[in-house]
Amino acid sequence: MRGIIYCDKLETGLAEFKKIIEDYANIGITCDKPVANANQARVTFNNGDEWIVVRATEGSARGHACNVAYIDRMIPDDFVETIIMPTIKAFPYQAYRYYNWGTW
């Protein structure tokens, strides 16, 4: 399973990333050391799942594919519809959720 956390600002994406790592740890699934740079972060878990954090920019967000997407609510709706939604390969399910609701 591959998951992507799309974020408007890397800090908000990394906060959600840490929550996911904690959730996996709580059910006994460990991970390799997360790797991060200026535009994205990545972690692979011992069950084979992979999660990455990607900034929602034209250059960074294109070309990815995932089974599950977590989408920062601060990302404009037109960007979500045209760039992010086509990357989700979990049909017929809608395998996405929004996060970062509290900053509106």
Task: Provide a role label for each language-model segment.
Residues M1-W104:
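Short, flexible loop motifs at catalytic/binding sites
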